[in-house]
């Protein structure tokens, strides 16, 4: 069962994106390089609680 997770910018801590993740097959935290509209640049976004 896929759960909805939130991705937060590592620089400004804004929560910009939501996505789904299967926690049984991928127990580690996700990290993507995505565009942050508050920083106005591409930054790493990590999964938050």
Swiss-Prot record:
Single Gene Ontology BP annotation: translation
One GO cellular component term noted in the UniProt record for this chain: ribonucleoprotein complex
Transmembrane parts of this sequence: none
Keyword Metal-binding on entry: no
Gene Ontology terms, MF aspect: structural constituent of ribosome
Entry keyword Ribonucleoprotein: yes
SUPFAM superfamilies in the cross-refs: Zn-binding ribosomal proteins
InterPro entries xref list: Ribosomal_bL33 (IPR001705), Ribosomal_bL33_CS (IPR018264), Ribosomal_bL33_sf (IPR038584), Ribosomal_zn-bd (IPR011332)
Entry keywords, A to Z: Ribonucleoprotein, Ribosomal protein
Top-rank taxon: Bacteria
UniProt-listed Pfam families: Ribosomal_L33
Family: Belongs to the bacterial ribosomal protein bL33 family.
Listed NCBIfam families: PRK00504.1 (NF001764), PRK00595.1 (NF001860), rpmG_bact (TIGR01023)
Protein name as annotated: Large ribosomal subunit protein bL33
Annotated source species: Syntrophotalea carbinolica (strain DSM 2380 / NBRC 103641 / GraBd1)
Gene encoding the protein: rpmG
